[in-house]
Amino acid sequence: YVVDKDTFGTFIWGSMSVNMSVDEDTTIEICGVCTDICVVSNALIMRAFRPNQKIECHKDWCAGTSVAAHEAALKVMESCQIEIV
């Protein structure tokens, strides 16, 4: 699935979670702009809806509002068991 959004947080993950035929062995990959706003918000919403799913954030496919903010967002995601690759 590719989700094209126009704002930072979305609850589309809830309906997708119910309708997706993704088993827990499948990896969900995330990326986007801004790491510290959009990406981290959606990663944490995704984690809430799919607590046992393997989720990866591609750090080189993201950009933050600053280098420090980008790094901080990656640390937050990592602390919530989102693998940073």
Give residue ranges: language-model regions.
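Active-site-adjacent betaalpha module
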Residues: Y1-V85
